[in-house]
Regions:
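Short boundary segments that mark the start of a structured unit
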Residues: 1-173
């Protein structure tokens, strides 16, 4: 035979895929956030990895937009991004919220050590103020109790507590 074919078998380990950092933070006023996913080395193959989204923030366009999905990093590239979009800058005083993205089920790669990224959406709204509904009231001595109404200046997603003192010339009993 005048032709001989020699096949080189690729025995290199596939690259690892993971997040550039395991956490990041941004204010509600940031409209979107790109989270970087890295390969440990260049690959001659397209890489795909599934991701799931959990956390305390509400997805589906309420606090942000990002659903479970698949990221593709094209052959020759070493990074990709997953974008948390439409972060809602509401006017509600609330606790900071998290969006947790977890990588799994890669194709042509292995999952690296930093497979979970937590993005914290920090609330940028002031706590509401609290006031009495009226500045004074009165009642007969025979009244055994009196309910006083207080108002919040705005709705709050958190429980609101307030300390108060009682003073004056009347004596408690």
């Amino acid at each position: 035979d005048s032709v001989h074919t020699y096949t080189i078998i690729d025995n290199d380990d596939p690259p690892a895929i993971d997040f550039n950092t395991t956490s990041s933070t941004g204010a509600e006023s940031v409209s979107s956030k790109a989270i970087t996913v890295d390969l440990s080395e260049v690959s001659s193959k397209d890489i795909t990895v599934d991701y799931t989204v959990t956390g305390t923030a509400t997805g589906g366009g309420t606090d942000y937009t990002l659903a479970n999905g698949t990221l593709t990093i094209s052959a020759g590239d070493t990074t990709g991004t997953i974008t948390i979009a439409s972060i809602d800058d509401d006017s509600l005083d609330e606790a900071d919220e998290t969006v947790i993205i977890t990588l799994s089920n890669p194709s042509n790669a292995t999952v690296g050590s930093d497979s979970v990224h937590t993005y914290t959406i920090t609330d940028n709204d002031s706590a509401p103020t609290i006031d009495f509904n009226a500045t004074s009231s009165n009642g007969a001595e025979s009244v055994s109790s009196k309910a006083l109404t207080v108002d919040l200046s705005a709705a709050s997603a958190q429980d609101v507590t307030v300390d108060y003192t009682v003073n004056g010339t009347a004596t408690g009993g």
